[in-house]
């Protein structure tokens, strides 16, 4: 394989002496954690608590991030020390006279500290104290008041009490198996089922309900109010990484059967649903799919009451805003054999028991459903119920889930019908008919019900189950089956129907959860696959399950051990390799070509005469050289898996791997009336015709399909960032509160928890390329003139943050950071970005204000221009209208002036006539006035001659005041009279309106009367044949009314004319009074007197006018009535 030029350059650089290295590349960090003091027993957490006060005093003089990094550095330093201790303990087996451990033992004796020692009687670890030591490697340990002598290899140091029940196992001062077991046991006893082992979450199944879930905890973890280990925290970390890095994430849940993987997966989905719930509305559907998949894919086994008999990968997609927009479900290798064969104490799939217990009476009657004990497929294991499980209630929840996932009611009933058909197939029996053990189907209730539920002919069904067709040239021969063959044919039909139904349900779920156009490339995949299994009798199904777990363990090792350590070594940083248990040898045993177990199984399955015994012999012949394989007598063989050694029996391996698909069964399904069965048959027929070559036929084997699915799954997981959850089963009896140390220890060893903690405490979980670090945290640099070289920029960033050198290492291509450093950098970045945002906010505010002021000033100027233009236009319009109005005003003024002159002339004329009449009286008044004038002149002379007395002056002043008051009163009266005049004008307008309406009415009456008169004239025209006397009479009788009518009309016209003239006079007279402006008291009195005269004249005319109007109305009405009577008489006489 050719190496790239970059790799060659890096390899050559590694070989160069440190003095010859390029200055542009960093030298590997020389930092190594110092060896711990032998007497050191307290953890970093405890030391930090002691020095808290001093740190608080010094905090003002330190950078805040430096303090956090220093505390993290102390923790990491302790971690590295513990690694050295553990390494020393591992080496003591080779050199039992290690002086360091002897000194440590003396320290433990002197301080009376505890150690762990395994008791041979029960194999349990117990706490004891070292009582004494010898010159050899033997120590005396006191256990429960009994002394026991042990070698140095048999004891391990115990952690102080302050570290009991720590959340993260990396916080333990002494890292060994008994310390891990004890810490998990303490937490398990307190219902703290979650613990951390570096990046891995350890979940111990409590086998009971614990109060650490629900809305309160969901909200707390969303708000980062809690940081305790929890499945919610893992899901939250996956979500944050997806949104921040825009990379797909995966949550891989593993563990043995019964460890709680399915429940853990459901809680992870629940948190993601709460975190990413949105307007798309699919989050509830995603949760409800668990109910459907558990019912159809889970069953009770001897080790787990709710064991998943299939693997599933739920890929949840998110929008750019982090909201769930859809999901996709993938399933792997459903255990079909469980439909027909069960071990004692186990159950078939949950759905069958739920259907029998929870179906409504109407549904049971329609589908012929009986109790579960009536079906052979269910009662063969003598286990029909599960403790603390209500199958009827589960069935009702299943119905709700069907509705939420939008499976139509019609298809729900068809699904239940096929389930009932599978149950009744188990009750189909056969009868032997000859000595060759050939059989035929017994025509009983079971056959009838199966044919009815499938929608096929019962006779056709019986033929298919008891015979098989063989092609002999062009002829097709029907061959009878033996009892074993017929039973297998029946069971094959049941398994085909159930497996096809399961796959169809998965397709319907995917249709309901389809992402569509909302796909953004951001997803979180949750893997829940069957756990490691080892029973008394292990067959093909257990081999497939354990093979899948081996592949998952390799993925786990690859990401947590191999890739990380290879990256450390390849990038040139200082690193001490951590050993771990690698299962690659076991995978080679299974997968290696051409002599791997899978290849040999496929090869043997293609030989028609091959048997399970020949297959077992071939395995022993080719695989004995592998350390993970061990042949047994007969058909048995052993494989040393990562989780333990398992004994397999090859009985049924070949037949189950071939999984022959009978053409007769496909044809039977295609003839059924059930639409689902027709759909299943079409797909199976397509798959049956698909293989065209030998290699294709090999790929059709069950193990080949399973291997292909497994590799596809691994490739998908490799493209994601993994988050691991290891589920631990505390006891094999599934009892709450029971903690079996040996059972837990075996699982911890299989998971490599000890090695995970070691590598987590001494490793660098966060790594970024120089370019990524420079781009992401370049904003932390205050000096913008720094070199643009990413390496130099990265170093400057780390120096700017005052990070201790032991908290990071600089590699050839990446920067490696210890735990906690990235959070400090993120906090510093947030702090700087908040300042930048504040500055941007202020600047944008200034820009906005300036823009607003400019816009306001421009608007004011524009408004002024517009108002000026409008004013000019209005001035032109007003000027033109003023010219017109001035001409009209002049004409009106001339008319008013003319009227004024006429009224003035009339008033003078009236005055002259009045003066002529009153001339004698006036002369007398003149004489009296002259005498009065002489008297007044005499008084004036007297007043001039005599001084006015004060009392007289006061009297005169009071009189003046009275006169002024009288003038004011007269002015008020004048105002009142003007108001009254205005009211009279209003009344006049009303009267005028009424008169007009009355005039119209009378005009109409007159028109109708004239028409009647004209008609009467036409009717009463002079008849020359009539007598002269009659004509004379008629003429006189008609003539009089006509004259009267003409008289009435003339009266009406006179009244109308008089009314018009009078209205003009009444309207003009007050105006003339108003127009004459005079402030003298005499003129005011004259105006008031003139107004009273106008008022009295108007009242008098109004009264006379009303009288004449009534008389005229009476005459007109009388003439109208006579005309009607005359008209009637004329018509009658005519």
Swiss-Prot record:
Myosin heavy chain that is required for the cell cycle-regulated transport of various organelles and proteins for their segregation. Functions by binding with its tail domain to receptor proteins on organelles and exerting force with its N-terminal motor domain against actin filaments, thereby transporting its cargo along polarized actin cables. Residues 913-939 are annotated as: Disordered. Residues 110-160 form the Myosin N-terminal SH3-like domain. Belongs to the TRAFAC class myosin-kinesin ATPase superfamily. Myosin family. Plant myosin class VIII subfamily. The keyword Coiled coil applies. Residues 832-861, 855-884, 891-920 form the IQ domain. One of its GO terms (cellular component) is myosin complex. It comes from the Eukaryota. GO terms for biological process: actin filament-based movement. Residues 589-623, 710-732 are annotated as: Actin-binding. Residues 953-999 form a coiled coil. This is Myosin-4. Signal peptide: none annotated. ATP binds at residues 255-262, 304-312. GO terms for molecular function: actin binding; ATP binding; calmodulin binding; cytoskeletal motor activity. SMART domains: IQ, MYSc. The gene is VIII-B. IQ domain mediates interaction with calmodulin. Keywords: Actin-binding, ATP-binding, Calmodulin-binding, Coiled coil, Motor protein, Myosin, Nucleotide-binding, Repeat. Homodimer. Residues 164-830 form the Myosin motor domain. Residues 918-933 have a biased composition (Basic residues).
């Amino acid at each position: 394989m050719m190496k790239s030029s970059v790799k060659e350059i890096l390899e050559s650089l590694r070989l160069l002496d440190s003095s010859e290295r390029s200055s542009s590349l960093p030298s590997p960090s020389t930092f190594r954690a110092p060896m711990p003091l032998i007497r050191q027993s307290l953890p970093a957490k405890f030391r930090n608590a002691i020095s808290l006060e001093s740190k608080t005093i010094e905090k003002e003089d330190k950078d805040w991030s430096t303090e956090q990094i220093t505390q993290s550095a102390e923790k990491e330093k302790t971690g590295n020390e513990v690694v050295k201790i553990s390494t020393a303990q591992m080496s003591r087996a080779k050199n039992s006279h290690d002086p360091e451990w002897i000194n440590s033992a003396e320290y433990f004796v002197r301080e009376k500290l505890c150690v762990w020692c395994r008791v041979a009687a029960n194999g349990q670890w117990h706490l004891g104290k070292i009582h004494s030591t010898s010159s050899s490697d033997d120590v005396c340990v006191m256990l429960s008041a009994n002394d026991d002598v042990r070698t140095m290899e048999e004891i391990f140091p115990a952690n102080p009490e302050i570290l009991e029940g720590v959340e993260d196992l990396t916080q333990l001062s002494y890292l060994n198996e008994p310390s891990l077991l004890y810490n998990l046991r303490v937490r398990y006893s307190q219902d703290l089922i979650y613990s951390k082992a570096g990046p891995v979450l350890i979940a111990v199944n409590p086998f009971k309900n614990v109060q650490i879930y629900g809305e309160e905890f969901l909200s707390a973890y969303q708000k980062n109010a809690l940081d305790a280990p929890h499945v919610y925290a893992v899901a939250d970390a996956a979500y944050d990484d997806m949104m921040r890095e825009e990379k797909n994430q995966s949550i891989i849940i593993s563990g043995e059967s019964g460890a709680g993987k399915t429940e853990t997966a459901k809680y992870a989905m629940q948190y993601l649903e709460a975190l990413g719930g949105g307007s798309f509305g699919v989050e509830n559907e995603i949760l409800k799919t668990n109910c459907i998949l558990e019912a159809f894919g889970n069953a009770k086994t001897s080790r787990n009451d709710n064991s998943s008999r299939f693997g599933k990968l739920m890929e949840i997609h998110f929008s750019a805003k982090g909201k769930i927009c859809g999901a996709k479900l993938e399933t792997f290798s459903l255990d079909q054999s469980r439909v027909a064969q069960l071990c004692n104490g186990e159950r078939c799939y949950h759905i069958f028991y739920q259907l029998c217990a929870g179906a409504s009476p109407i549904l049971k009657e329609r589908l012929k459903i009986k109790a579960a004990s009536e079906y052979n497929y269910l009662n063969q294991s003598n286990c029909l119920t599960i403790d603390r499980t209500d199958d009827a209630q589960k069935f009702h929840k299943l119905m709700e889930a069907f509705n939420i996932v939008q499976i139509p009611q019609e298809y729900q009933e068809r699904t239940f019908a096929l389930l009932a058909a599978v149950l009744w197939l188990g009750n189909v029996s056969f009868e032997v008919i000859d000595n060759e053990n050939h059989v035929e189907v017994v025509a009983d209730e079971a056959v009838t019900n199966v044919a009815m539920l499938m929608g096929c002919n019962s006779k056709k069904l019986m033929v298919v189950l008891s015979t098989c067709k063989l092609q002999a040239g062009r002829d097709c021969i029907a061959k009878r089956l033996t009892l074993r063959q017929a039973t297998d044919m029946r069971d094959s039909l049941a398994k085909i129907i159930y497996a096809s139904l399961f796959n169809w349900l998965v397709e319907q779920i995917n249709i309901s959860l389809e992402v569509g156009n909302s796909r953004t490339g951001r997803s979180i995949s949750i893997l829940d696959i069957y756990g490691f299994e080892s029973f008394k009798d292990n067959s093909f199904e257990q081999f497939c399950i354990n093979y899948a777990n081996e592949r998952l363990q390799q993925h786990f090792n690859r990401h947590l051990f191999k890739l990380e350590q290879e990256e450390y070594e390849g990038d040139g940083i200082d690193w001490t390799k951590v050993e771990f248990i690698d299962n690659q040898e076991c995978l080679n045993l299974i997968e290696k070509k051409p002599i791997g177990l899978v290849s040999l199984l496929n090869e043997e399955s293609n030989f028609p005469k091959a048997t399970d015994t020949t297959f077992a012999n071939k395995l022993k012949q080719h695989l004995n050289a592998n350390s993970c394989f061990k042949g047994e007598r007969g058909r048995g063989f052993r494989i040393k898996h990562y989780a333990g050694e398992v004994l397999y029996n090859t009985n049924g391996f070949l037949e189950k791997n071939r999984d022959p698909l009978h053409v007769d069964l496909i044809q039977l399904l295609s003839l059924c009336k059930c639409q689902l069965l027709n759909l299943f048959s079409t797909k199976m027929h397509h798959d049956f015709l698909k293989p065209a070559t030998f290699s294709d036929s090999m790929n059709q084997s069950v193990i080949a399909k399973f291997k292909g699915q497994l590799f596809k799954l691994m490739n998908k997981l490799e493209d994601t960032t993994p988050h691991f959850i290891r589920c631990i089963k505390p006891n094999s009896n599934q009892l709450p509160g029971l903690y079996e140390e040996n059972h837990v220890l075996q699982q911890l060893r299989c998971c490599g928890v000890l090695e995970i903690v070691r590598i987590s405490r001494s490793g660098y979980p966060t790594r970024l390329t120089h370019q990524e670090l420079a781009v992401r945290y370049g904003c932390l640099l205050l000096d913008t003139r720094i070199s643009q070289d990413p390496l130099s920029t990265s170093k400057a960033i780390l120096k700017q943050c005052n990070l201790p050198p032991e908290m990071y290492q600089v590699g050839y291509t990446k920067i490696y950071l210890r735990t906690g450093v990235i959070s400090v950098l993120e906090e510093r970045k947030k702090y700087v970005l908040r300042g930048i945002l504040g500055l941007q906010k202020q600047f944008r505010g200034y820009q906005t204000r300036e823009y607003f002021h400019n816009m306001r000033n421009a608007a004011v100027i524009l408004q002024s221009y517009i108002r000026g233009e409008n004013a000019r236009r209005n001035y032109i319009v007003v000027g033109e209208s003023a010219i017109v109005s001035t001409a009209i005003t002049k004409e009106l003024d001339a008319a008013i002036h003319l009227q004024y002159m006429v009224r003035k002339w009339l008033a003078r004329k009236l005055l002259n006539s009045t003066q002529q009449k009153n001339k004698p009286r006036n002369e007398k008044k003149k004489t009296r006035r002259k005498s009065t004038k002489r008297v007044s002149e005499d008084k004036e002379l007297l007043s001039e001659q005599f001084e006015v007395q004060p009392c007289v002056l006061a009297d005169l002043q009071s009189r003046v005041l009275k006169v002024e008051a009288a003038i004011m009163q007269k002015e008020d009266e004048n105002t009142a009279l003007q108001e009254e005049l205005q009211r009279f004008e209003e009344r006049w307008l009303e009267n005028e309106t009424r008169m007009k309406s009355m005039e119209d009415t009378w005009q109409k009456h007159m028109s109708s009367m004239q028409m009647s008169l004209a008609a009467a004239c036409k009717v009463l025209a002079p008849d020359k044949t009539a007598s002269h006397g009659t004509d004379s009479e008629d003429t006189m009788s008609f003539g009089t009314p006509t004259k009267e009518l003409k008289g009435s009309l003339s009266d009406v016209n006179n009244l109308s004319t008089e009314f018009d003239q009078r209205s003009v006079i009444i309207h003009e007279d007050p105006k003339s009074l108003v127009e004459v402006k005079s402030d003298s008291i005499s003129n005011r009195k004259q105006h008031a007197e003139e107004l009273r005269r106008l008022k009295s004249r108007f009242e008098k005319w109004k009264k006379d006018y009303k009288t004449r109007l009534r008389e005229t109305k009476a005459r007109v009405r009388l003439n109208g009535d006579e005309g009607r009577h005359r008209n009637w008489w004329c018509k009658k006489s005519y």
